[in-house]
């Protein structure tokens, strides 16, 4: 059992030697990749060491119990510990999403429901910012279009983590958030106290570590500049600082007007464009990544909800995993961990099942 770990241990030892080489740290891109892989393998090696020790301990206990019944009392505890250790190791050996250790760019857009939808989009942004803070991630709003009543029509925010462990990566957690989020509550503008249903859409992209990862031909870009506008469409800038970049081969369009500088808006637009192109390239190379990404788009286009936020009942429900809890107030303040963990667990169960059938 776990014969494949032998090769992973050898790879782990090789990476450990590489990390002691000063030349590695002169190449930030390679150094980052080596550190990430080393952190991932370290978890596997530690789990395997624990499993091997428990296996040996159980075997020894059984041999001793055959000679002296007094040792038999230790066997049930060791068997349970070995079972838990084996399950932990099996999960660690599930092939990971190669993007798990990446940072992420999230887009939140108002959907059905007009002004209430825009207000809910703002609430979702607040929820994710609080969640990021609880995980000690950095959050940067790179583009935001507000509504007349203080809500959000569209916002793009970049989340950056510090852990080299893929299991703790930003993308590893936020990738499950793509889709339609539905809210049920009494809007502040509702005088009759009736519950309204509205929705907001979320898209998530893995962020490109280095610009060189995604090759972009400058000749494929159409760049338009215009004056930035505020709620209602009124101009808020007297110079052409806003930027719209169209990538001709894919038709992807990214607009930025958050910064006062045209250069800063252009850099931000290119940052988002690279993330979207990376996602598209990976879709074309990986059928699983393609299906995952199409799932985000499909749910948004068909208005299929992935999650419902019911304020009158203080209830949150994830319709993909069956997760349900009555602590919506805490979730909206950033206590999103258990909801996302239910998605991670469901994903792992699916991957384990696929491994068993292969």
From Swiss-Prot:
Post-translational modification: Methylated by PrmC. Methylation increases the termination efficiency of RF1.
Name the record gives this protein: Peptide chain release factor 1
Keywords, ordered alphabetically: Cytoplasm, Methylation, Protein biosynthesis
Annotated function: Peptide chain release factor 1 directs the termination of translation in response to the peptide chain termination codons UAG and UAA.
N5-methylglutamine: residues carrying this PTM: 234
Organism, scientific name: Leifsonia xyli subsp. xyli (strain CTCB07)
Organism phylogeny: Bacteria, Bacillati, Actinomycetota, Actinomycetes, Micrococcales
UniProt-listed InterPro entries: PCRF, Pep_chain_release_fac_I, Pep_chain_release_fac_I_sf, Prokaryotic/Mito_RF, RF-1
Entry keyword Plastid: no
Record SUPFAM superfamilies: Release factor (SSF75620)
Subcellular location: Cytoplasm
Family according to the record: Belongs to the prokaryotic/mitochondrial release factor family.
